[in-house]
Curated annotation (Swiss-Prot):
Positions with a binding annotation for substrate: R64, S65, G66, N77, T81, I82, D83, K91
Protein name: Deoxyuridine 5'-triphosphate nucleotidohydrolase
Lineage of source species: Bacteria, Bacillati, Actinomycetota, Actinomycetes, Mycobacteriales
SUPFAM superfamilies: dUTPase-like (SSF51283)
General function of this protein: This enzyme is involved in nucleotide metabolism: it produces dUMP, the immediate precursor of thymidine nucleotides and it decreases the intracellular concentration of dUTP so that uracil cannot be incorporated into DNA.
Listed transmembrane segments: none
PANTHER family hit by this protein: DEOXYURIDINE 5'-TRIPHOSPHATE NUCLEOTIDOHYDROLASE
Listed GO MF terms: dUTP diphosphatase activity; magnesium ion binding
Composition bias, Gly residues: 144-154
Amino acid sequence: MSTSLAVVRLDRELPMPTRAHDGDAGVDLYSAENVELAPGQRALVSTGIAVAIPHGMVGLVHPRSGLAARVGLSIVNSPGTIDAGYRGEIKVSLINLDPQTPVVISRGDRIAQLLVQRVELPELVEVTSFDEAGLADTTRGDGGHGSSGGHASL
């Protein structure tokens, strides 16, 4: 089942978002500006596009794995969420996590990837307890934040 995504190129000199390989989940987003990020610095970077995410779907903006691994470039609010009703320009909140080296982003560089996925939109129902709602205790209960172990420091 194929879904189409309406894309407006706000900057006609930049290419449409592209998939590097047939079957890739994400499409690459391009920087619409030149930016230099000092170590630890963040910036909201324009992509020059706007999209119309279909109702019942969500756009998720993820870091590009090669940039994260090689130069420490990531996304502050990863993944960034694009709701179906948003029609403005996609901007990416990038951060340089390298402790020593600045990251230079040139206009036209691929800086992130956009995934579009179906999303459940549940009705929120207030309950006074999970037992009352028929959602009895689980083996995990309220354990979180390292409660399952898996690392020597935990």
